Amino acid sequence: MHAVRYSQAFIPTLKEAPADAQVASHKLLVRAGFIRQLGAGIYDYLPLAKRSLAKVEAIVREEMDAIGGQEFYLPALHPAEIWKESGRWDVMGDNMFRLKDRKGGDYCLGMTHEEIFTAVARDELRSYRQLPQVWYQIQTKFRDEPRPKSGLLRVRQFTMKDAYSFDVDRAGLDRSYEDQRRAYEKIFTRCGLDFVAVQAHSGSMGGSESSEFMVRTDAGEDLVAACPRCRYAANTETATSRVAAEADGPGLGTPEKFATPGVVTIEALEQAPYSVAARRQLKTLVYMADEQPVIAVVRGDQELNEAKLQTATGAVAVRPAHPEEIPPLMGARAGSLGAVRFTRARVLLDPSLADRKDMVTGANEDGFHLRGVDVRRDVLAHGATLAELRTVKAGEGCPRCDGTLDVFKALEIGHIFKLGTKYSESMKATVLDAEGKQVPIVMGSYGIGVERILAAAIELHHDDNGIVFPMAIAPFHATVLTLGPEPELRKAAEEVVAALGKEGVEVLFDDRDERAGVKFKDADLLGIPIRIAVGKKGLAAGNVEWKLRKGGAVELVPVGEVARKAAEAVRAAT
């Protein structure tokens, strides 16, 4: 195997990270010469990055092929018509890069490929005998990310492995989904990632069920609620919890209005002379679900989760109502709103409030609130319905056992979906079943962010000196360097490099005319798992220095044994 000589390689390392780099992976990928920024959310992948990404892709391919996946390569440029068939041309909004050709035709750059793969299935699959099918590709995707940041964690151009399963029924989908879940677990384990699979929100993808694969890191932008006792885990967009019961007073026979001039926040109502604790307040929020008003009610000390509201309403998109949209509907401005006996729009109430009494809420009149509200009598009895709306908090009870939930930041590295017939029905992708009836194909969709695996590995595996790569995705298995300029050291190093190559070990040979300290520092920065140093004193005794990047003392290894030792280390870790 051919070694790469550092003196001839393009490895533009930097002493300092860019000023705008906030997370470890961004800082280190730039400093170690893996990436350079071309524009907001757009990166050049330099040779070291390309080597590591190729290894990630190879692992993904192996595990996809192992479950019967067949690799495609479909266009990144899509005509608008195919997205309009599924109804997602408008749903994707500003997140989609759109363009026109010279004839005025509408096109987009693909964010994902459900529509394109469904079109292939529609045109080519005719019978249940052709199913199941598992198709995948590893391809460039585009997303007009509004706030690109954090290096490779939030970008506008990225590489995705997207796979799609096609089955004749739900039972087949369940099997395909579990095959993908197991394959994902193998992929992430092989890439050196500690991960957790969590229940997730399907968003614009649709479907009946989805799971995200998350890496716990402060660089993540998702929040996961997990129980260490029973291993329940869910994105907070879907997570539920047990909330301690509140001891309410008997309340009043009917709600009583009282003046609250200038009081428009939960916090203000907590202050004297009112002194109403936030947990005794009803927070009433006005949203637009597919541009239709909906009222969401949570406890005053809780936060509304918009993903849960979207799920509860079944809407394609939800947004907070604009200030000018609220008074014509509610009769008051935000800060004085309530849902008592309100019937002019759909009202959704978090289940934790169902049996609350003696609550306080806005009176739908500026400067006034109501006390003594009985939720069941004054809200639910007038047409409101219960729906999971609140965001769970750390310390709340696990919904599955007596444990308590931990809530932590996490980074999504993969997402799998049971799409069902969402796309096949809208795009008329059908097959004949065993009884000769035309039925819509039952689909699943399964995505992995290739660059995110690289970035996540660095977030998990780094120290003050640089990257600490897992062996399987390191750009090289080993680096060989000399500790002096003497010709005999160079000759011995060349022989070690050749022996490593014969054993299949990928080597970066640091043949630069630099001090040993510089070479050691760069080796640590690049994160190459094995460092082999050839020095005068050790060589005189027939040894070379051996050190693992992930820690451990320097060992002296006989020159004739170092290649075998390295090969064994590589095999054990990959």
Curated annotation (Swiss-Prot):
Catalytic reaction equation(s): tRNA(Pro) + L-proline + ATP = L-prolyl-tRNA(Pro) + AMP + diphosphate
MF terms in GO: aminoacyl-tRNA deacylase activity; ATP binding; proline-tRNA ligase activity
GO cellular component, one term: cytosol
Top EC category: ligase
Compartment list: Cytoplasm
Key word rRNA-binding present: no
Tagged with keyword ATP-binding: yes
Keyword terms, alphabetized: Aminoacyl-tRNA synthetase, ATP-binding, Cytoplasm, Ligase, Nucleotide-binding, Protein biosynthesis
GO biological process: prolyl-tRNA aminoacylation
Pfam families: HGTP_anticodon, tRNA-synt_2b, tRNA_edit
PANTHER family: MITOCHONDRIAL RIBOSOME PROTEIN L39/PROLYL-TRNA LIGASE FAMILY MEMBER, PROLINE--TRNA LIGASE
NCBIfam families: PRK09194.1, proS_fam_II
Family label: Belongs to the class-II aminoacyl-tRNA synthetase family. ProS type 1 subfamily.
Description of how the protein assembles with itself and partners: Homodimer.
Protein name: Proline--tRNA ligase
Naturally occurring in which organism (per UniProt): Anaeromyxobacter dehalogenans (strain 2CP-1 / ATCC BAA-258)
Species classification: Bacteria, Pseudomonadati, Myxococcota, Myxococcia, Myxococcales
